[in-house]
């Protein structure tokens, strides 16, 4: 009987050691998975940063030329508006005088297509 209880004790101890080894293996596996996940996330972040930087440089190159065109168009528009304003200032009095002259100096006359009914 003592040998049986000793055998049972050995089996229980062996089972306990096996359970500990399995638990340790699970912990190691969980750590490896966590580490692999962190490494993968770091790679993804690095790739994302590289692609974002590449996109920004291409966008800057494309928008840089458009920015110059936009500035040129805006400057040309300003020059035209200034030219129109100065022309308006120069011709304002003359146009007003012409307009008032046409309105106030009425010369009544018969229309050339008018036929007197006889």
UniProtKB/Swiss-Prot annotation:
A GO cellular-component term linked to this record: synaptic vesicle membrane
The entry's note on the tissues where this protein occurs is: Expressed in brain (at protein level).
Q: What is this protein called?
A: V-type proton ATPase subunit G 2
Q: Which domain of life is it from?
A: Eukaryota
Q: What processes does the entry annotate via GO biological process terms?
A: pH reduction; proton transmembrane transport; synaptic vesicle lumen acidification
* Topology relative to the membrane: Peripheral membrane protein
Per the record, which residues fall in region Disordered? 25-90
Q: Which UniProt keywords apply?
A: Coiled coil, Cytoplasmic vesicle, Hydrogen ion transport, Ion transport, Membrane, Transport
PANTHER family assigned: V-TYPE PROTON ATPASE SUBUNIT G 2 (PTHR12713:SF13), VACUOLAR ATP SYNTHASE SUBUNIT G (PTHR12713)
How does the record describe its quaternary structure?
V-ATPase is a heteromultimeric enzyme made up of two complexes: the ATP-hydrolytic V1 complex and the proton translocation V0 complex. The V1 complex consists of three catalytic AB heterodimers that form a heterohexamer, three peripheral stalks each consisting of EG heterodimers, one central rotor including subunits D and F, and the regulatory subunits C and H. The proton translocation complex V0 consists of the proton transport subunit a, a ring of proteolipid subunits c9c'', rotary subunit d, subunits e and f, and the accessory subunits ATP6AP1/Ac45 and ATP6AP2/PRR.
Is Chaperone among this UniProt entry's keywords?
A: no
Q: Where in the cell is it found?
A: Melanosome; Cytoplasmic vesicle, Clathrin-coated vesicle membrane
Pfam families hit by this protein: V-ATPase_G
Spell out the coiled coil positions from the record. Answer: 8-57
Could you tell me where the Polar residues compositional bias lies? 56-69, 78-89
- Record's InterPro entries? V-ATPase_G (IPR005124)
**Family as reported in the entry's similarity comment:** Belongs to the V-ATPase G subunit family.
Q: What role does it play?
A: Subunit of the V1 complex of vacuolar(H+)-ATPase (V-ATPase), a multisubunit enzyme composed of a peripheral complex (V1) that hydrolyzes ATP and a membrane integral complex (V0) that translocates protons. V-ATPase is responsible for acidifying and maintaining the pH of intracellular compartments and in some cell types, is targeted to the plasma membrane, where it is responsible for acidifying the extracellular environment.
The upper taxonomy is: Eukaryota, Metazoa, Chordata, Craniata, Vertebrata
Q: Name one GO molecular function term.
A: ATP hydrolysis activity
- Regions of compositional bias (Basic and acidic residues) in chain numbering: 35-55
Main localization, broad class: other
**Is Membrane found in the keyword set?**
yes
């Amino acid at each position: 009987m003592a040998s049986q209880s000793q055998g049972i004790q050995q089996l229980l101890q062996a089972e306990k050691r096996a359970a500990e080894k399995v638990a340790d293996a699970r912990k190691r596996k969980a750590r490896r998975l966590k580490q692999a996940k962190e490494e993968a996330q770091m790679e993804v972040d690095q790739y994302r940063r590289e692609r974002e930087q590449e996109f920004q440089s291409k966008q800057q190159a494309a928008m840089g030329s458009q920015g110059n065109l936009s500035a040129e168009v805006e400057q040309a528009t300003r020059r035209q508006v200034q030219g129109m304003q100065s022309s308006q200032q120069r011709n304002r009095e003359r146009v007003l005088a012409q307009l008032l002259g046409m309105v106030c100096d009425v010369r009544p006359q018969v229309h050339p297509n008018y036929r007197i009914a006889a």
